[in-house]
């Protein structure tokens, strides 16, 4: 284990850093100027169809510049994980991840079976949305995040802060106090910039009894929702910061519970104050988020499973990985998406695939989401 940890610094960890570096620095040419990958991906939420479509095409073109190098990263990280799981006596990388997650295989299989059973419901929603936007062959990928209803309201950082504090004071003052502390003590890196990673995450600094949060804030409700999610992680950190160091670790399925609970509460509070086009937007946004947490997460799980299996027999070139991703999307999204406009490069931009220490960084989101929905339902009853 000591040797594996030492060699990892120039092995899996180095390949992971390469993926992060390339996706955060790749030059994205959009309408005559260069922007970051995070900025062009944020345009998927634009209310303008032409903007969403051109941003999607620009994003796809940008990946072509880095696809081969990142394919090397993915292959060698997965090869290292497979080798170490065998040396440690696990039947597979998934078996090792399940032990890390403190989850039984039967639990995972039951959840995936339930997800598979409900895929037709999500596909019906996607086809309906596609029809509302004028499409006849399913929803094209560039309209997957298209807002419906009125979606032009934006929040400054100060407005987002006050909105979150007011909303969560009604849930628990302890959560609201932590949110105020995070904003006022500058725990949050808000805006996208050159060289910054996409997406969002929260890291605990337990020795300081603080957390640090990264987002790519654009001012829309979705970004406020992301802040609520990440601050949920910070709240989880606050609950365990006084525990002994060996008791501060927790499995990924549980890690997504407080964060998703926050999203559920914020969404319900926002919908209670809305009506008409604004309510339509919030309702559709909630279904859209559930689609990501269930359908897209399932596609990521299928993709990673196939990559682990196939990478043991051959090196997977970028074209191989693109085909595996398309196959996974077709199995999950089905006829809900336009088969001529999917996203073969979703393996390039998602850093979750490139963790050498935690594989299958996908199904915990589905579990945390479903668990949090159940907890919130119980909370309302009580």
Segments predicted by a language model, with ranges:
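His/Asp/Glu-rich acidic catalytic environments and adjacent acidic regulatory segments
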Residues: 1-106, 110, 114-117, 163-175, ...
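Active-site recognition of the HExxH zinc-binding catalytic motif
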Residues: 89, 218-240, 259, 264, ...
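Long, K/E/R/D-enriched contiguous segments that form extended
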Residues: 128-176, 180, 184, 202, ...
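Catalytic zinc-binding patch centered on the HExxH motif and its immediate surroundings
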Residues: 153-155, 188-210
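Conserved binding/catalytic microenvironments
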Residues: 215, 222, 230, 245-252
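C-terminal, non-catalytic "cap/extension" segments appended to globular domains
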Residues: 1, 27, 102, 131, ...
């Amino acid at each position: 284990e000591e040797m594996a940890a030492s060699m990892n610094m120039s092995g899996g960890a180095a390949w992971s850093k390469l993926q992060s570096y390339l996706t955060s620095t790749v030059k994205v040419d959009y309408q005559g100027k260069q922007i970051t990958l995070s900025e062009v991906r944020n345009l998927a939420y634009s209310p303008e169809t032409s903007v969403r479509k051109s941003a999607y095409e620009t994003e796809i073109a940008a990946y072509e510049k880095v696809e081969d190098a990142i394919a090397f990263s993915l292959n060698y990280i997965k090869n290292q994980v497979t080798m170490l799981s065998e040396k440690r006596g696990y039947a597979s990388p998934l078996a090792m991840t399940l032990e890390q997650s403190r989850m039984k295989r039967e639990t995972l299989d039951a959840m995936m079976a339930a997800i598979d059973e409900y895929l037709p419901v999500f596909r019906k929603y996607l086809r309906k949305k596609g029809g509302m936007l004028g499409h006849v062959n399913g929803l094209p990928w560039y309209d997957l995040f298209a807002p419906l209803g009125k979606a032009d309201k934006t929040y400054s950082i100060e407005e987002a802060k006050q909105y979150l504090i007011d909303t969560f004071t009604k849930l628990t003052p302890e959560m609201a106090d932590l949110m105020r502390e995070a904003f006022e003590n500058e725990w949050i890196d808000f805006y996208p910039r050159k060289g910054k990673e996409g997406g969002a995450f929260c890291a605990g600094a337990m020795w300081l009894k603080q957390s640090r949060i990264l987002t790519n804030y654009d001012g829309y409700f979705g970004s406020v929702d992301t802040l609520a999610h990440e601050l949920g992680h910070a709240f989880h950190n606050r609950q365990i910061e006084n525990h002994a160091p060996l008791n501060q670790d927790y499995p990924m399925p549980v890690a997504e519970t407080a964060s998703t609970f926050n999203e559920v509460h914020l969404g319900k509070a926002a919908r209670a104050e809305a009506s008409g086009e604004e309510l339509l937007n919030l309702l559709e946004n909630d279904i859209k988020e559930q689609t990501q947490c269930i359908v897209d997460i399932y596609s990521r799980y299928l993709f990673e499973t196939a990559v682990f299996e196939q990478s043991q027999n051959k090196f997977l070139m970028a074209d191989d990985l693109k085909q595996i991703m398309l196959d996974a999307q077709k199995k999950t999204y089905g006829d809900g998406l336009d088969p001529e406009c999917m996203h073969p490069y979703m393996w390039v931009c998602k850093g979750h695939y490139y963790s050498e220490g935690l594989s299958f960084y996908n199904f915990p989101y589905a579990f945390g989401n479903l668990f949090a929905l159940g907890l919130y339902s119980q909370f309302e009853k009580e």
